[in-house]
């Protein structure tokens, strides 16, 4: 059986921090599924289709990465792909508190599921999608925070 990991998120938009985690975690798995979440609760700036397209553009050079859109429980998606490991990023203490709760919740829904946490590299530690959204909403230049493939896409906002 293939070693498969899932890296879920809203990716609204995808940032260099996300790509850093994808790069490092893709080396641990035969296949890494990047699962772009519907997430109506977060009121995303970009539609699900736009976020999926941006992620596909940003990850096209990774041979073992597949991008999918999903709605519903992450634990169910993991079962569908026969995945036993979720990949998550941790930047700050508040991320840890939230991710710990989510990890326990996912484990309660799928007992085989483990969560692997990645700390960002120092150069990406401050980057978040919300910072990028704020910069682009104010017509600022966020090109140094996102993959070059998607900057033309987000600069149209």
Curated annotation (Swiss-Prot):
Site feature Transition state stabilizer: at which residues? 18
Q: Which domain of life is it from?
A: Bacteria
- Pathway membership, UniProt: Cofactor biosynthesis; coenzyme A biosynthesis; CoA from (R)-pantothenate: step 4/5
Required cofactor names? Mg(2+)
Catalytic activity line of the entry: (R)-4'-phosphopantetheine + ATP + H(+) = 3'-dephospho-CoA + diphosphate
Q: What is its EC number?
A: 2.7.7.3
Subunit note:
Homohexamer.
Protein name (database record): Phosphopantetheine adenylyltransferase
